[in-house]
Design a protein with these regions (language model features):
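Disordered, acidic Ser/Thr/Pro-rich linker "stalks" and the adjacent N-terminal cap
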Residues: 311-332
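Solvent-exposed, flexible loop/coil residues
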Residues: 48, 52-55, 59-62, 74-76, ...
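Short, well-ordered coil/turn elements that cap or connect secondary structure elements
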Residues: 33, 144, 161, 180-182, ...
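Substrate-binding cleft of carbohydrate-active enzyme catalytic domains
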Residues: 1-147
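Flexible, acidic glycine-rich loops studded with aromatic residues
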Residues: 148-154, 159-164, 169-313
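Short, solvent-exposed coil/turn linker segments
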Residues: 20, 71, 126, 214-215, ...
Length: 332
């Protein structure tokens, strides 16, 4: 607290927990001892409702609870981001700083006088270009601090910043496009790597964001197929599993969602496709799950999995003669 710019005790707009600086340093050091690098993510310009509730002057409307995105036409937005990122850089020694960049609504920018002025001054054709303008400016700031910018694949929209690394979540296409353009990429396609998705029959599983990523589906990912070519494959750094916690209120629930699917994602990351063997992997997973359960952890009980059940979508009789029919797998 004290003279910190954006942290105020008893702010009525503040809710939930927080980390003290010393606690963050403790987490970073603990991870370092385990050879893990903690990469912080400060979301921008979208997913900013909580910022705009407290600092409504950074919204296009100037009001709280109206806009979802930071106002890019407002120079104060960039001052705010620089100050926040400066504190983050001080606390996290990671080479990369993740700036989010995903799911910006952008609707308010199209009618915001300040954003439209910014677009005209910078020769930007559309709101995608406006987001790209922000990403470029933030990258210049991070590079000046000796750090590199990492963002979700939406940062491709409007033109990718020169040194940006792309984390591809809406499929693999964004990561492939970035790699072909000479940028590094991390593959984390949601249909393989999202651990907040249900992993089995949702009628038997706890709440989840969506369905359906089985252990076998996660294991089947090929993040860097040889068909991409010798110039592209080296630009793909690896894979990442994501657990978003809107529907995961407890540590036990988190363990259930993570394990054993994170084992599949890890093995995808370090294994050549021709060396992968799902049957062998599955047998090892059953042993690992039993080991976890014996020690009081809460993994998904893989031995009782229902699985994809492809036989349930084989058509037997259809009354729509001569009409196209699409069959979806259960829970998808």
């Amino acid at each position: 607290y004290g003279d910190r710019r954006y942290c105020h005790r008893d702010d009525p707009a503040a809710e939930g927990g927080y980390y003290m600086q010393e606690e963050i340093r403790e987490v970073v050091e603990y991870a370092r001892a385990l050879h893990i690098t903690v990469i912080p993510e400060i979301e921008m310009p979208g997913h900013s409702e909580e910022v705009l509730a407290t600092y409504p002057q950074l919204a296009c409307s100037g009001k709280p609870y109206v806009n979802k995105d930071l106002c890019i036409g407002n120079e104060e937005t960039f001052e705010f981001l620089k100050n926040v990122l400066s504190e983050v850089i001080e606390l996290f020694p990671s080479e990369y700083i993740h700036i989010g960049g995903d799911e910006a609504d952008k609707a308010s920018w199209a009618t915001c006088p300040r954003c439209r002025t910014r677009m005209r001054q910078e020769g930007l054709e559309d709101v995608d270009g406006l987001q790209s303008y922000l990403v470029h400016r933030v990258e210049v700031f991070l590079n000046g601090k000796g750090r590199r910018l990492l963002g979700w694949d939406e940062i491709l929209q409007g033109g990718l910043a020169p040194d940006a690394t792309v984390m591809s979540w809406r499929g693999s296409e964004g990561g492939i496009a970035a790699a072909r353009a000479g940028h590094q990429a991390v593959m984390t396609p949601n249909s393989y790597c999202y651990l907040d998705y249900c992993q089995d029959d949702p009628t038997r599983e706890p709440a989840a964001a969506a369905a359906f990523v089985t252990l076998e589906k996660a294991y089947s990912l090929d993040p860097a197929p040889d068909s991409l070519g010798v110039d592209v494959v080296p630009m793909i750094l690896g894979v990442q599993g994501n657990l978003w916690c809107e529907h995961v209120p407890t540590g036990e629930h988190a363990e259930h969602m993570i394990w054993p699917r994170l084992m599949a994602i890890a093995e995808v990351g370090w294994s050549l496709p021709e060396r992968k063997d799902y049957d062998d992997f599955h047998a090892r997973v059953l042993d690992a799950v039993a080991w976890m359960q014996e020690r009081g952890y809460h993994p998904f009980d893989q031995k009782n999995a229902v699985g994809d059940r492809p036989e349930s979508i084989e058509p037997v009789l259809c009354l729509s003669t001569g009409k196209p029919v699409v069959y979806h797998t259960p829970y998808s």
